[in-house]
Amino acid sequence: MKKFILIIFIFVIFIFGIFYMLFFTKIGNSTISKYIENSFNEKQNDFKLKFDTFIIDTNNINLVANINDSSKVKIDGKINSLFDLKAEFIYKIDIKDLSIFNNIVQKELKGSLAANGDLITKNGLSTIIGTSNIANSSTKYEINLNKTDIKSLDLDIKNANMDELLALLSEPIYSFGKLNLNAKLIKNSSNFFNGDFLFDINDGKINNEIVQKEFNFPIKQTITYNLKSLNKLENTNVLSDIKLISSLANLDMKNLIIDLVTKDISSNYFLDILNLRQIEEFINIALNGDLKVVGNINKNQKTLKIDGNSNIAGGVANFVLLDDNLDLKLKDANSLKLLYILNKDQFFNSNLSLDSNYNIVSKIGNINIEVKNGNFIKNNFIQKIEDFTKIDLSKEIFEYGAINSKIDNKKIYSNLNLTSKKSDIKSKDSFIDFNKNIIDTKLDINLNKNIFSVKLEDDLNKPKIIVDVQDLIKNILEKKLDKYINKEDDAQKIELLKGIKSLF
């Protein structure tokens, strides 16, 4: 029995001696360093690893590694206990070219990275504390790990350059600006992160050149912005409050909820466009005035729904966009104000309501407009009619009117009906082509039994106006002839006048 115990004791001493010689002697350190170097250098060709210093003993660690002769990683620390793996280290990282790690992280990286701090370990639990100048920022961080699993993260980034961050991640530089980010995240028992992360972008500016290159969409104006986002992470949900202030528009999104698993999104929003003329290059329509919209956004794996309401042209507008279909309703607006917003001639004053359905993909839809108590405004068109007919159309009040239109890819086919107590204006199959900017319509006008027609042709902005007064002249002559016939006693003259009347 004593021999057996002695053999075991000698064996343990031998194993410990081998272990000590392998890990804590100069020969052992040299062997391990060469093994690590060869392992890294043989498995990849992106960079070469070489240790300038590799010292490990029972109390201290001192490592200096060169990466491609231009970058260095230094680790210097004290081993307090081998049995519970308790140690404290100071590290310094200076990477001149992050692209050497592209294959390892499966992501294109650019730029440089400098970081330094402390690493404390015990029983597989580690805390990494440090600072960095990533993207020319002032960054502080604290990461707690259980072996290699992140348990908590405390990150504070101040004044990082947006363009440098995007370049570091090898993303197109869509924007310039200063990024601030503060995150405090803790992993829960369900292996999800909970906590708050706040970020803002100050002095943001869109990079027009990159936007044109990436999206083939030229932007002429300078777009500046500031963005602030307050976020809470609860398991798989992100709860956010976002405020965007820009030279184009302001946007508030409160109670934004994003499910990171299903990608579902829900939020309310408030959109404030201060000057509609500034968005002309994005919508290809010159508009006047401003626009404020309040609504909701809901998206799931099957559908996208956006609704909103606004006060437009003195009326109330409501819309619902469900996937590709847009339903728009406008009630009790003023037509003059609406024409001003649409940057069109203010030729008709009335109370106006409309109901429209439009598919934004097929570009097919319909629009029905109802007007009440309307009258034409004196303009060149009305004056030309008056010159031909001696009738002032602007004095007529049309109590009711309807315009029913079909939309087919910027082509509109319409029927018009305006009625007053004694008059009416009708048009059938009127045609407007916004692509070619042309109009082709005929208005049949009956003003207190004075009948004539007006054709509008060619250029939509300055159409050719053709007034057909044949029916009007006929009606006037018939009235005159009837007057003479009723006064005439001579039968032969009466027959002559009737013969003349029959010519019309």
Regions found by a protein language model. Name each.
Residues 209-211, 377-384:
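Outer-membrane beta-barrel and related beta-rich outer-membrane complex signature
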Residues 1-13, 17, 41, 53, ...:
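Extended terminal
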Residues 85-87, 126, 151, 191-195, ...:
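Outer-envelope beta-barrel architecture signal
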Residues 69, 95, 134-136, 159-161, ...:
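Transmembrane beta-strands of outer-membrane beta-barrel pores
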Residues 17-90, 96-102, 119-121, 454:
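Terminal hydrophobic membrane-targeting helix
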Residues 66, 94-98, 110, 121-124, ...:
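Flexible, solvent-exposed coil segments and beta strand-coil junctions
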Residues 46-48, 66-76, 103-118, 133-142, ...:
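Amphipathic hydrophobic-ligand
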